[in-house]
């Protein structure tokens, strides 16, 4: 388990992280979210030992996080850091050896990953010769080649088309199922919803939402209603329980104050026309983020 115990990081008078407490169990994906400047990257860098901790402590399986256990951690940063003039094979084997992996094992493991991502033909090409998407695959391999126990992923699907996003998702899920603990950050809330059971949303270095995603959604109160109809539904706008109204190509999407309002809206629709779809939904993570942080995630 990764334990972040009342961690604070200051830069002069500025608190980038303020008394953060997190427990991330083994074999689980944990989402760490927040707008720009919320403290995510600072937290990642303290876990990696790249930044000192002002107050508190961080431990992995009961041992303080420091240089001696850094080989057990993999990190895919948002800012890419590959050597553009270096060949793929030479670069990845070199990085794995820096993490304590034997060359023979690194070469064997590299072959497995290149084949998995359908990029075996690029083994002896320079990184700068690859497309942005394939560079992202190489960057991902660099974070996992040494078989880390803890993996930190910051925007791992950036620059990938939908097919390759699914390919990387499958790899991430496979790593989790093999026992790797994963700390995950992304501005694509649908990816976080799909992959993470637990999460924390930071604002100004402090958690504003924390816990199991299902429980967070359940306790949020507000619900969404999707209605598909070709009829004029604007008469529903008079209902005080409707908080947001958004017209779509198929009808309308509403945010309502609570679940009971949906029954009242459904009753109002009776005899008013043909309704192809009426669906009550939990709030999305995007809805919760906007409500709690008050900004669009960028």
UniProtKB/Swiss-Prot annotation:
Where the record annotates domain ABC transporter, the positions are 2-229
Its placement in the membrane is given as:
Peripheral membrane protein
Q: Which GO terms describe its molecular function?
A: ATP binding; ATP hydrolysis activity
Keywords on this record?
ATP-binding, Cell membrane, Membrane, Nucleotide-binding, Transport
Cellular location(s): Cell membrane
Q: Does the keyword Cell membrane apply?
A: yes
Per the record, its GO cellular-component terms are: plasma membrane
The coiled-coil segments of this chain are none
**Residues reported to bind ATP:** 34-41
Which PANTHER family does the annotation name? ABC TRANSPORTER ATP-BINDING PROTEIN, ABC TRANSPORTER ATP-BINDING PROTEIN NATA
Family named by the database record: Belongs to the ABC transporter superfamily.
Q: What is this protein called?
A: Uncharacterized ABC transporter ATP-binding protein YhaQ
Which taxonomic lineage is given here? Answer: Bacteria, Bacillati, Bacillota, Bacilli, Bacillales
Q: Which gene encodes it?
A: yhaQ
